[in-house]
């Protein structure tokens, strides 16, 4: 019983100064409540900081100590200081965390800016569009066909124009706006593709008739030259072998030699005019069938000339036999 009684007395002695200090603090607050001096605001501001993290009892004790600094015990002062230091440490930690978060955000933003400077996607997009448009322009204007013919020559044929009802759509509206040789929005040209488009194309003969006429005229000329040479040589030999014949027979032989020579150029002119008229009628459609026709006509003309020469030779021989 004595131990418990002593403990109760000790607790009452410890609580008594606290209650007294609380009463003193209330009295001082009532006194200062009516005052409007500048010190009243400072006292309230000085007490407000420690009272944030304290309970009701600890707040009353801190207020009492602030109002009456001469009262209280050293143990209570140390406890209050510990609590205040803990609160200040927590606030410092929160401020450090906020500063770290801000630094992280700034680092992330810097990375984004560096990536945007290193990879300019806008410029790449414009360059790619310019390249595609230049390719389409090159393909759109490349409207001719190259055909390899005999003799290692190239022939150029234009495509047939589309009918008036079906018009081709216009593809390169962007280049029409910018201009074919205009620079891009960033001051850069179209590059190698633009230079390739400006290179002149090799000149190629466009007349089909001239190219087809050369291989066709050669066999016809050879066939016409051979009978003329033979016909001119034979009468000359006969005239030299028979110098004693009469003048009339010589004149007949000369006339016979001149007639085939006159007829042969006429036949050559006719044979040359016929393919020329055919070429003028259809200069764009040269086929192997026309070559075959020309060969047949040349052969027919050569056969006719040979028959005429044979008939004339037979007549001359008959005349010579009669004269002898």
UniProtKB/Swiss-Prot annotation:
Annotated region (Disordered), positions in chain: 1-82, 88-107, 211-324
InterPro entries with a match to the protein in the record: CT47
Acidic residues biased stretches: 246-258, 266-277
Basic and acidic residues biased stretches: 285-318
Pfam family, one: CT47
Family label: Belongs to the CT47 family.
The name this protein goes by in its record: Cancer/testis antigen family 47 member C1
Species the sequence originates in: Homo sapiens
């Amino acid at each position: 019983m004595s131990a418990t009684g002593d403990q109760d007395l000790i607790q009452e002695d410890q609580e008594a100064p606290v209650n007294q200090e609380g009463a003193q603090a209330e009295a001082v607050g009532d006194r200062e409540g009516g005052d409007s001096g500048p010190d009243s605001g400072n006292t309230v501001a000085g007490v407000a900081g420690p009272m944030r993290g304290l309970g009701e009892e600890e707040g009353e004790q801190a207020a009492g100590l602030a109002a009456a600094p001469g009262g209280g015990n050293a143990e209570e002062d140390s406890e209050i200081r510990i609590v205040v230091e803990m609160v200040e440490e927590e606030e410092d930690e929160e401020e450090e965390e906020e500063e770290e978060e801000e630094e992280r955000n700034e680092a992330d933003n810097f990375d984004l800016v560096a990536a945007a400077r290193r990879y300019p996607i806008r410029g790449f997009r414009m360059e790619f569009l310019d390249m595609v448009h230049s390719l389409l322009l090159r393909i759109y204007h490349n409207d001719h066909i190259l055909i390899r013919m005999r003799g290692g020559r190239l022939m150029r044929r234009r495509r047939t124009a589309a009918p008036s009802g079906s018009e081709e759509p216009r593809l390169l509206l962007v280049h029409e706006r910018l201009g074919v040789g205009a620079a891009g929005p960033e001051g850069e040209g179209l590059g190698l593709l633009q230079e390739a488009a400006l290179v002149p194309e090799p000149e190629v003969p466009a007349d089909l008739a001239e190219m087809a006429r050369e291989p066709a005229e050669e066999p016809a000329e050879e066939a016409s030259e051979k009978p003329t040479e033979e016909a001119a040589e034979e009468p000359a030999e006969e005239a030299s072998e028979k110098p004693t014949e009469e003048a009339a027979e010589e004149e007949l032989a000369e006339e016979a030699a001149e007639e085939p020579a006159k007829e042969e150029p006429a036949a050559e002119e006719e044979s040359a005019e016929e393919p020329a008229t055919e070429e003028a009628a259809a200069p764009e459609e040269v086929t192997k069938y026309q070559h075959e026709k020309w060969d047949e006509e040349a052969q027919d003309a050569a056969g006719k000339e040979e028959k005429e020469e044979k008939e004339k030779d037979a007549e001359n021989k008959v005349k010579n036999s009669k004269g002898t």
